[in-house]
Every structure is written in C-alpha cells, then in structure tokens.
C-alpha cells in the first residue's frame, strides 16, 4: 500500500467519504488540489466552509437555502397553493428544468426504506401537514421516484393526507421519450398503459 504524508493521507480519507469517490478518485482529486495554486485550494476550502456555515433548511419547505424562507416559498410569482413533494433537494432542479411548473415544493429528505431503518418518523412531513391543515394547499403533487421506496413513500403520504381533503396527484411514469418500446420493462409498460390519456 502506498504511504502518503499525513496531510495528503488525511485529505484522501476525507474525499473517500464522498458518494461515488473511491480510493483512486480520492487520490487523483487530492493530487489535483496539491498541484493547484494556493488561492484555488483556499477558495475550495472556503466554499466548503461557507456551505456548512451559511446554508440551512427552509422553514416552510425544507429546501436547502441561504435565506429563509427560500426563493420558491417567498416568490410572489409562484403558485403557493400548488406543492410538489420531492425526496431530495436535488429533485427540485429536475422539475425546474422543465420550465413547466410554477408551484412550490416540499422536500422530504428521504424515502421510506424499512430495510435501511428509515421509517415515517425520519421523513420531514410535520410542516407539510401543518400547511395542509391550515388550508394553504389546494393540490399536492407526489413526485417521488418510481422505485419501491418511492412508491411506498407516495402511498404512505396519500394515506396520511387523504383525510385532510386536499387534492393528491402522482407524477406519471411510463415509456421515456425517444426509447424503443421493445426494450421497456414490464413494470414501466404496465404503468404507461395504465396512465394513458385521451388524444
């Protein structure tokens, strides 16, 4: 095993903790940082420090933000009564890319996953329930992933929210645009057929 000087070994070990970064990638990144200018290395360290010091969760929707409420919840041009419920803050970017959604969001910060010890108490639903109970929401779009965990989470939320008499909708799933039907799996094809619409 290659031995590195303590500062290099420590940086490699910290980089390995990032998702998708193995030992070799961590070593490449560490050597890249070492070869960078001092200003670039300090800018990177400062950005990481600022990330932890300045970002927090929006008190309304749980999105990651540097202002509270976040830019979506405080926007006068957004439909505040239409709420898209997503698993993670990164899902917001996917919805925003469509440029077809003008509502606001609620971030759960996870999905139900009993095998990984994630139960309903781990999802951030308290302020979502409060918004619905106060009559501030007309429709909730459940935009969890079409995975076992995402479906379980959507079903749990539907059961939890249905008694509050709010309109609940689920994002459609089906055949991806540009794909060949021959290669679509059975579950996707079933959902596409069930979610068909009039022309």
Swiss-Prot record:
UniProt keyword annotation of Transferase present: no
Keyword flag Nucleotide-binding: no
Assigned keywords, A-Z: DNA damage, DNA recombination, DNA repair, Metal-binding, Zinc, Zinc-finger
GO molecular function: DNA binding; zinc ion binding
SUPFAM superfamilies documented for this protein: Recombination protein RecR
Zinc fingers (C4-type), renumbered ranges: 58-73
GO biological process: DNA recombination; DNA repair
Toprim domain: residues covered: 81-176
Functional summary from the UniProt entry: May play a role in DNA repair. It seems to be involved in an RecBC-independent recombinational process of DNA repair. It may act with RecF and RecO.
Family affiliation: Belongs to the RecR family.
Protein name according to UniProt: Recombination protein RecR
Organism placement in taxonomy: Bacteria, Pseudomonadati, Acidobacteriota, Terriglobia, Terriglobales
Gene name per UniProt: recR
């Amino acid at each position: 095993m290659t031995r590195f000087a303590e500062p290099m070994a420590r940086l490699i070990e910290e980089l390995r903790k990032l998702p998708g970064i193995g030992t070799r990638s961590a070593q490449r990144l560490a050597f890249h940082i070492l070869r960078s200018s001092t200003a670039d290395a300090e800018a990177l360290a400062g950005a990481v420090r600022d990330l932890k010091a300045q970002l927090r969760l929006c008190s309304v929707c749980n999105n990651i933000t540097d202002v509270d409420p976040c830019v979506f919840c405080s926007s006068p041009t957004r439909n505040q009564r239409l709420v898209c419920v997503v698993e993670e803050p990164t899902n917001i970017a996917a919805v925003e890319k469509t440029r077809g959604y003008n509502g606001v969001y609620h971030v759960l910060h996870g999905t139900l996953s009993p095998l990984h010890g994630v139960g309903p108490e781990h999802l951030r639903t308290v302020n979502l329930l409060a918004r619905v109970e106060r009559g501030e929401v007309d429709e909730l779009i459940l935009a969890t992933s079409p995975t076992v965990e995402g479906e379980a989470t959507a079903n749990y939320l539907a059961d939890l929210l249905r008694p509050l008499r709010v309109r609940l909708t689920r994002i459609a799933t089906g055949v991806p645009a540009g794909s060949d039907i021959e290669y679509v799996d059975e579950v996707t094809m079933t959902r596409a057929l069930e979610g068909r619409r009039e022309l």
